[in-house]
């Protein structure tokens, strides 16, 4: 240890004397070290002195403690000696103690002798008071007598309870049997009280004879007294498990009073159903309406009854809770039964109304209806989902039946040769679109009564059923068309009926598009709310559907309507083509070349049919007229390609070119006449220019200019097939087939990058089809949609 101290001292000195100039401070450093040493020594002396003082004090305390222990031991010994005689004293005083107990019992008996001797008289007075209750009420007097008798009985029983002996239980039974009449009048009193409290609202309203609200207050005062007595004995029992508690306690009359009120409320809700489905189809609506009136009236009376009840009862909140609980229980029972569609709608509509400001949320009632329904909804989410699914399935069955009957009725009218109705624009129509989409509107209106969540499912199932309807409708008018072509004279109104069908389908497309726009707008409006929603409202429902899926299904439905409309227009075209087919065969033939009136017959036939076709909607009419124009112009091209006529001289070629141009003028005039109708917003595109251009190529006199004329033809129709152009050129008598093909290929190669008119693509494709094949409808679905959107823009 000395070595460590020495090393530490050397290190300290080395740290202080690191530079030569620090040696000058050596005397000062020595003085500082001496002062520090003296201070440390003084601190050590002080510490040692304090320890010594503490030791002296401890020794003195130990001496004092020893003396105290000796004194206490002596005192305890003296007390033990003095208490020695006490056990013998207890035995000597036993008789005195027993005498004191008997004296207490006798004193209690003497004090209650009046009640004991007058027990039967008092019981009769109580019964008389209870009997008088109907004419004014003496419930307080009856209860006073009962309390007197109970006090006498309980004091005697308490004295017996204090005794410890073999006869204690026997004496208790003797007293209980003696006072058993008290229990009967207590039961009678409580029965009267529960009757009065059960009619609290009628009492408050003043519809009952007697004291009215005063009787209610009397009953509540008695209940409060009994509650205080129960509390006294229960607190005594909680402090001492062997404490005396009178028989029949606690009575819990407050709980029984509330149970009486709850039973009355339950009866008020359940007892309003006076009929069932067998007696009245509207039984549920009538029952719910009565419930609504009863609940509103009773809750307003409950507010009036608040002053009659103690504040801690919170009677108004209890009434609200009891009515809500009873309503929930009853409606759950109704929901579990097999409900018809109208009953289901009435139930769901009433549940929505239940929380509205017209009922539970009425300002006068001052009830937080939303909080109540959040804590205890009328129907569970699973039950609501189940009811919504039931409604969807019921609606599906109804729609199937309605749509089937609608198509059946429509078909029946066709075969009766009834002319369709005309609207204010002169367009034929039937009631099918209004009926069909009226069903959708009515079903959606009902769905709103059920739940907003079920509307997408209803619209979706309606779309599905409309898809089936479109197919069945198409099959029905296809069968009608087959019967017509089998015996045309039998069905005079075929054309007008098919026109009405096409117009109906156009109306269906418009209506579907309107609903689709409404759904799209609702999707945009609800996008933010849907993004913030953690759980979909329709989660757990079997028939739930996304709105985007609705849009896609509606597009598919519109395609189905459009296809059916195309078929209807095709049947109108087929009817015309059947009549003009013999004349079409004569076009660009020897007979035509020599002056046949084939085209004039065609034009007159189309013009004659136009008297019916003008009752078509403009878009559909344009499609039909364009179909017919396709058919006529394609007949020229087909005749040229099949070499229906051989032109052996310039004179014949010139005559053919002249006839072709004359036919073009006739067709153009005919279609110009059609386009002048007030409802034809746009001119009908004409295809006849290709016939005139072909006539120019055929009738050209100077062969040296043929290449130039062919180039001009190719520039006008750059998408013309090489086979068709070579056939036009080869119709001339001064050029061979190989030369025609070579020239056609050459000129078309020069114009391959020129802008092309797509309408001629359809024409060129059509020329290859047989007469019986169906013509394309120019993308009718797209035309209908574009026309509808343009009408919307014009309206805006």
UniProtKB/Swiss-Prot annotation:
Protein keywords: Coiled coil, Exocytosis, Protein transport, Transport
GO biological process: exocyst localization; exocytosis; protein transport; vesicle tethering involved in exocytosis
Protein origin, superkingdom: Eukaryota
Keyword Protein transport tagged: yes
A single GO cellular-component term on record: exocyst
Bilayer-spanning residue ranges: none
Single GO MF descriptor: SNARE binding
The keyword Cytoplasm appears for this protein: no
Recorded coiled-coil stretches: 87-174
Classification via InterPro entries: EXOC3/Sec6, EXOC3/Sec6_C
Pfam families: Sec6
Family matches, as Gene3D superfamilies: 1.10.357.50, Exocyst complex component Sec6, C-terminal domain
Family: Belongs to the SEC6 family.
Subunit structure: The exocyst complex is composed of sec-3/exoc1, sec-5/exoc2, sec-6/exoc3, sec-8/exoc4, sec-10/exoc5, sec-15/exoc6, exo-70/exoc7 and exo-84/exoc8.
Function: Component of the exocyst complex involved in the docking of exocytic vesicles with fusion sites on the plasma membrane.
Protein's name according to its UniProt entry: Exocyst complex component 3
